[in-house]
Design a protein with these regions (language model features):
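Short acidic-glycine loop/turn motifs at beta-strand connectors
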Residues: 82-84, 148-154, 182-183, 204-208, ...
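Active-site-proximal beta-strand/loop segments in catalytic clefts of secreted hydrolases
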Residues: 83, 114-118, 159, 215-216, ...
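Short, surface-exposed charged micro-motifs
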Residues: 79, 146, 201
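Zymogen propeptides
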Residues: 21-139
Length: 262
């Protein structure tokens, strides 16, 4: 029997972040304290590549650390690679009623919980979501991509190359944007906007395996991430940006407290 793996959206974390941004009463500035100059310790550079670690049959973990020309640590990319033969994928969605990753995991018992998609201020999806075989919202047209669960299994597709057909019997789906790797492993985001942020990605490699990735330090622009994925040895056929900014996150349950990124 396949283990359950859910792509869950949206998150209460978005609401909590908004609450943290509320204005606070202005306090008197603290007194200035001058300390003697002491050289700061040089941060230890983590291994650039952990290699694939098998967590259980069909599930592998890899951590890739990115450095610049001066060998300074810029980004950490957590990659989970899943063989669809071992897992059941699904999308859960409560319009207007977001939950935290931990709450979704407790409610569903899923092995892996990942947030994704874009929403209005009232937490309604701006693109198409299919949850429990029921459609919500409207499909993007000509841009972005879709994570879909069909009778044959999960897939990541380009909506420009393969538009959504309301007649197709999808079990679950989530649309997002932009496409970072176009089908065939081609660069998906050629323009540089200069905006750095944390990112969550879903991808499918040439062997049909599903990858969930999170770039946790916020160093990548969309173009930079697109270029990185295309040049990597992950052999990705197509990759879709799921989320960006503080809400990016995934939760992998397991022994102890599990693995949380984001």
């Amino acid at each position: 029997l396949n283990r359950s793996l859910f792509l869950i959206l949206p998150l209460l974390a978005l609401l909590l972040m908004a609450g943290c941004m509320a204005e606070q009463p202005t306090a008197a500035p603290p007194p200035t304290i001058f300390l003697p100059a002491t050289p700061l310790p040089t941060p230890t550079l983590p291994p650039l590549d952990s290699g694939w670690q098998t967590l259980e049959p069909g599930l592998e973990l890899r951590i890739l650390n990115v450095v610049d020309e001066q060998r300074l640590w810029q980004e950490s990319v957590t990659v989970l690679r899943l063989d669809p033969a071992y897992f059941r994928f699904d999308v859960h969605y409560r319009p207007g009623k977001p939950l935290q990753l931990e709450a979704w995991q407790m409610e569903t018992g899923a092995l892996l919980v990942v947030n994704g998609g874009y929403y209005t201020e009232e937490y309604f999806a701006t693109g198409l979501v299919i949850s429990g075989t029921a459609p919500f919202g409207s499909s993007y047209a000509g841009f972005g991509g879709m994570f879909a669960v069909t009778a044959a299994g999960p897939e990541v597709r380009s909506l420009a190359a393969q538009p959504y057909d309301p007649a197709e019997p999808l079990q679950a789906a989530l649309q997002s944007f932009p496409l970072l790797v176009r089908p065939g492993g081609e660069l998906g985001f050629p323009d540089e906007d200069g905006q750095q942020a944390r990112r969550t990605i879903v991808a499918q490699d040439r062997a049909g395996r599903i990858h969930f990735l999170i770039a946790n330090r916020g160093a990548f622009t969309l173009h930079g991430l697109s270029s990185y994925l295309v040049a990597s040895d992950l052999e990705l056929d197509v990759a879709l940006n799921l989320d960006g900014g503080p809400s990016s996150g995934l939760l992998l349950a397991g022994e102890g407290d599990g693995v949380v990124a984001g």
